[in-house]
């Protein structure tokens, strides 16, 4: 099967309700020396109209009455019943626990599970906590948020637990499923099965122990996964750069007011012809009256130094632009000669 994708979002909720109210968990501030504390209620049944898949689950042997048998390699777990009757199985011995029994503990390494006892009339409420091992993977709020979230979604929507995903989440919370009782070294086999299959193989295949949809303290969960070579590739850090809503609104105020749909789709980059008005001369003067130069003066058009027909000019053979010396030429003839660009200095035949 492909790695699991959550069906709902319960991150950020101190009180989470699963299976339509069959299981309710309220996270509380843990006392010193404990890494978590929550108040949990299991019910025998759910009143009122409920979805068909939930009713089918409640009537099946897989209905949630408590977690499956497991053990904690490095932590001691504590239970204190508030109301109802809790049943607890520790290393094969079943005990009935009520509020009168006070707090009971299960030592690290003991195979155990607890459940709502049949003697409870309607529900069972119990406080759970555990010692703080200081390790990355341990029983804490992150683990329980993800375990109860996955348990709910897998049973209601996927038809059951995915074995690899289950082991990956269990390994993320120092909760390991033991091998069957007839297997020698059942705890060691169970521990390494969770680590090898859940963390190593599962991590390489994309199975995560934690999901952002379930996790309130996601930064802490990311730090946990970064500690594993097999899971760090599953972590994405871009979320940390995401701006909050107020910052996004501030960015919007500085943007252009036009929407994109009003922007031009394309710009016309096709070449256009350069249109210039005709140049008209009248005896060396533009029609608009702006004086330019005489035909025979210095820098003039015909006979002066650097004129059009002299040095650097276009038309005549003289060094400094002597067309005829002292003669006037017709303006029309001069324009034609200038346009033809013949024989001046820097022209075709003149002095270079």
From Swiss-Prot:
GO molecular function terms noted in the UniProt entry: oxidoreductase activity
This protein's record includes keyword Oxidoreductase: yes
Signal peptide: none
Key words, A-Z: Oxidoreductase
EC number annotated for this UniProt entry: 1.-.-.-
The UniProt record lists the keyword Zinc: no
Recorded metabolic or biological pathway in which this protein acts: Secondary metabolite biosynthesis
Function as written in the Swiss-Prot or TrEMBL entry: Oxidoreductase; part of the gene cluster that mediates the biosynthesis of aculins. The pathway begins with the synthesis of 6-methylsalicylic acid by the polyketide synthase (PKS) acuA via condensation of acetate and malonate units. The 6-methylsalicylic acid decarboxylase acuB then catalyzes the decarboxylation of 6-methylsalicylic acid to yield m-cresol (also known as 3-methylphenol). These first reactions occur in the cytosol.
Similarity section: Belongs to the oxidoreductase OpS7 family.
Protein name: Oxidoreductase acuE
Species of origin: Aspergillus aculeatus (strain ATCC 16872 / CBS 172.66 / WB 5094)
Gene assigned in the entry: acuE
């Amino acid at each position: 099967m492909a790695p699991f994708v959550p069906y709902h979002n319960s991150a950020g909720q101190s009180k989470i309700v699963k299976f339509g109210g069959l299981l309710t968990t309220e996270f509380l501030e843990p006392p010193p020396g404990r890494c978590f504390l929550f108040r949990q209620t299991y019910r025998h049944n759910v009143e009122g109209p409920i979805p068909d898949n939930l009713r089918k689950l409640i009537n099946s042997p897989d209905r949630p009455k408590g977690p499956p048998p497991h053990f904690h390699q490095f932590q001691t777990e504590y239970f204190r019943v508030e109301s109802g009757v809790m049943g607890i199985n520790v290393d094969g011995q079943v005990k009935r626990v009520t509020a009168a029994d006070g707090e009971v503990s299960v030592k690290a390494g003991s195979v155990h599970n607890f459940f709502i006892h049949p003697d409870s009339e309607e529900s069972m409420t119990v406080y759970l906590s555990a010692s703080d091992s200081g390790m990355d993977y341990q029983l804490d709020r992150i683990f329980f948020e993800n375990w109860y979230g996955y348990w709910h979604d897998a049973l209601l929507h996927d038809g059951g637990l995915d074995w690899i995903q289950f082991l990956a989440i269990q390994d993320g919370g120092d909760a390991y499923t033991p091998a069957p009782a007839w297997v020698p070294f059942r705890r060691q086999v169970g521990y390494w099965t969770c680590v090898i299959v859940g963390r190593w193989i599962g991590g390489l295949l994309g199975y995560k122990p934690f999901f952002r949809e379930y996790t309130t303290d996601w930064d802490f969960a990311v730090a946990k996964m970064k500690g594993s070579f097999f899971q760090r590739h599953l972590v994405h850090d871009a979320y940390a750069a995401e701006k909050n809503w107020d910052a996004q609104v501030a960015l919007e105020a500085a943007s252009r007011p036009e929407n994109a749909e009003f922007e031009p789709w394309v710009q016309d980059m096709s070449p256009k012809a350069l249109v210039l008005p005709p140049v008209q001369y009248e005896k060396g003067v533009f029609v608009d009256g702006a004086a330019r130069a005489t035909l025979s003066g210095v820098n003039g058009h015909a006979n002066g130094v650097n004129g059009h027909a002299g040095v650097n000019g276009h038309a005549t053979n003289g060094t400094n632009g002597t067309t005829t010396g002292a003669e006037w030429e017709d303006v029309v003839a001069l324009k034609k000669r200038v346009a033809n660009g013949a024989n001046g200095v820097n022209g075709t035949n003149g002095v270079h």
